Amino acid sequence: MNPLQEVIFCRQFGNQHRVPKPYYRRKTYLCYQLKLPEGTLIHKDCLRNKKKRHAEMCFIDKIKALTRDTSQRFEIICYITWSPCPFCAEELVAFVKDNPHLSLRIFASRLYVHWRWKYQQGLRHLHASGIPVAVMSLPEFEDCWRNFVDHQDRSFQPWPNLDQYSKSIKRRLGKILTPLNDLRNDFRNLKLE
């Protein structure tokens, strides 16, 4: 695995609402750890989008090749810069469903196009299918830094307002994952008559 450069990590995994100057394009990076249930690391890697192929699809291909032994259980932790798009969410759900010996957890730095219904549905589908999607906070950023960044033995230095941004994104994700029935009941409970 080629570790990420510090500047790439901070730019791409940064959870700020707006890109700080100098402006740059945010890309999708997916860093994962494949472990045995007792914690033994089998493999780790960092992937990114390739031409017309999302990082999640590259991830599925890699994991398929690494987990052919269906008698062995595997746990996978993913750190991703953007939450999966609806297509990738669907593919991840199908992949985990077809491979019950795998357990997948996703930590996203930011939510991708979270205001669009289709993207929200993708996140809900992951959640409903038993694939937890959570927002990265300081412990996840630190773990990602330790395991995937060429940090030259430097500790992770959080950018300003990292915690505040994480909490804001978590609230948004929580609202997306709240079942619509609960929202309807909450609306009825307002008794706006």
UniProtKB/Swiss-Prot annotation:
It is found in: Cytoplasm. GO terms for biological process: cytidine to uridine editing; defense response to virus; DNA cytosine deamination; negative regulation of single stranded viral RNA replication via double stranded DNA intermediate. Changing A65 to F/L/Y: Confers resistance to FIV vif-mediated degradation. Its cofactor is Zn(2+). Its EC number is 3.5.4.38. SUPFAM superfamilies: Cytidine deaminase-like (SSF53927). Expressed in peripheral blood mononuclear cells. Transmembrane segments: none annotated. Changing A94T: In allele A3Z3; haplotype 3. One of its GO terms (molecular function) is RNA binding. Zn(2+) binds at H54, C85, C88. It catalyses: a 2'-deoxycytidine in single-stranded DNA + H2O + H(+) = a 2'-deoxyuridine in single-stranded DNA + NH4(+). Belongs to the cytidine and deoxycytidylate deaminase family. DNA deaminase (cytidine deaminase) which acts as an inhibitor of retrovirus replication and retrotransposon mobility via deaminase-dependent and -independent mechanisms. Selectively targets single-stranded DNA and does not deaminate double-stranded DNA or single- or double-stranded RNA. Exhibits single-stranded DNA deaminase activity (in vitro). Incorporates into the released virions of the virion infectivity factor (vif)-deficient feline immunodeficiency virus (FIV) and suppresses FIV infectivity, probably in a deaminase-dependent manner (in vitro). This is DNA dC->dU-editing enzyme APOBEC-3H. It comes from Felis catus.
